[in-house]
Amino acid sequence: MNVAVAILILTLSALQAPPPNMSAIPAGDFWMGRVHFFLIDEVGWLERDRRDDLPAHRVYIDAFNMDKYETTNEEFARFAAATDASTPWYWVKGAVPKGEERFPVHDVTWFQADAYCKWAGKRLPTEAEWERAARGGLDRQKFSWGDGGLGLSGSDTDTQVSAEATNTKRAHVGSPTGPTTVGSYPPNGFGLHDMTGNVWEWTNDWYDRDYYSVTPDRNPPGPAKGVYKVIRGGGWSDDDDRNLMNHYRNFSDPSRGAPTIGFRCAKN
């Protein structure tokens, strides 16, 4: 092989490689939203169903990079030290609680999450990017690992598999009392950990119940304005299968943090 060609190939490979601790999410389209129907005895929440995940629609997303892990306390501490940003209330005198360095930071507002990502040279993912990444290449599936539910049948087998897959109350029969070390559970098909459970994750999008009726089919940016920001993925306190599904949409006040909400960053 010509030396110049070999150098060019190596250079292009290096340019295409994702940054450290990030996974490359390939460009492609996928079904976004709810693409299946529930039996009433499967979940029992149809009466209070917002139906904001309908209609299901095909969406194309350009290639991007996504953090493999939720942003940790120790990472946020470096940001706070460099920028004099405020720290979460549960830190002890402004310091990360001992032993929780690799836990996901939580009780941070959307604005704090946005500021961290920008400081790190990244950004918050759009809601569509988040769902594309969470699915891990599995289209039309309820969960990041496929269609297997979290103990829907009540069998010991289902519960055991779930406990090995995610940190959430539903999986561990009520045992979790908070988030756990990032990366404690197997990654999805794109190499991302804790896209289900541990903490909910802020996205860049404003929440609009009816956005799926008007969303563009390529790289939807989210609504131009709103009151709440979209959060995704479910958290350690969830005992409802619905909250843990790839398509499930939730929202929160961007000016308020919560013990169940954290974030991770994306990058073009």
State the predicted function of each range:
Residues 1-85, 110-111, 137-139, 148, ...:
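Short, compositionally biased
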Residues 24-25, 31, 36-41, 45-48, ...:
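Functional-site microenvironments in short loops/helix caps that host divalent-cation chemistry
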